[in-house]
Amino acid sequence: MATPSDSSPTAPPGGGAVAPGQLIGERYRLEQCLSSDPQAPQGRLWRAADTLAGGAPAALRQLGPAVDPEAAGRRWAKLQGLLHPQVPRFGAAIAEGSDLWLVREWQDGRTYRELLEARAARQLVFGGGEVLLMLRQLLPVLVVLHGQDLVHGDLCPANLLRRERDGLPVLLD
């Protein structure tokens, strides 16, 4: 999610050598790299365990040295102020080595891309009613974002998660 006035170029991904088991910010133990494309411009996404919260899961985004840390920090601070039940809470921004790590609340569920692929494998699609319901559930989230002068910039099935506990769409990345 970015501000409309954010004109920084797409930054290369995080490049620091890290591996599962590594501790980030003396708190988050990396468990699994979830990025399907490690060269993605938004960096690498990791599932981690918060060692100060009994191993609770967290999502960490690893941004490399090509990212402007001041601009990313300003954007992250704005996101930390966002409070909506369909937007994961945004935690710390951790500078470690040449990388910037952005922490957010973990959400259990499947992305709409995964749901589409699973249905396509069975030669099924989402019905019109399902799509309309999802859009009605998502529009209030976008209203909150836009009210804070934030835009998502990449609203697609891969960035929408159907939350396991209540079935609501959750806006990611």
Model feature map: region roles:
Residues 93:
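Activation-segment/catalytic-loop signature of the eukaryotic protein kinase fold
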Residues 112-125:
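AlphaC helix of the protein kinase catalytic domain
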Residues 97-111:
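Conserved short submotifs of the Hanks-type protein kinase catalytic core
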Residues 134-135:
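Activation segment signature within eukaryotic-like protein kinase domains
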Residues 49-56:
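Conserved N-lobe loop of protein kinases adjacent to the ATP-binding glycine-rich P-loop
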Residues 142, 146-163:
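Catalytic-loop of the protein kinase fold
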Residues 66-81:
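AlphaC helix of the eukaryotic protein kinase fold
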Residues 83-87:
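Flexible N-lobe loop architecture of eukaryotic-like protein kinase catalytic domains
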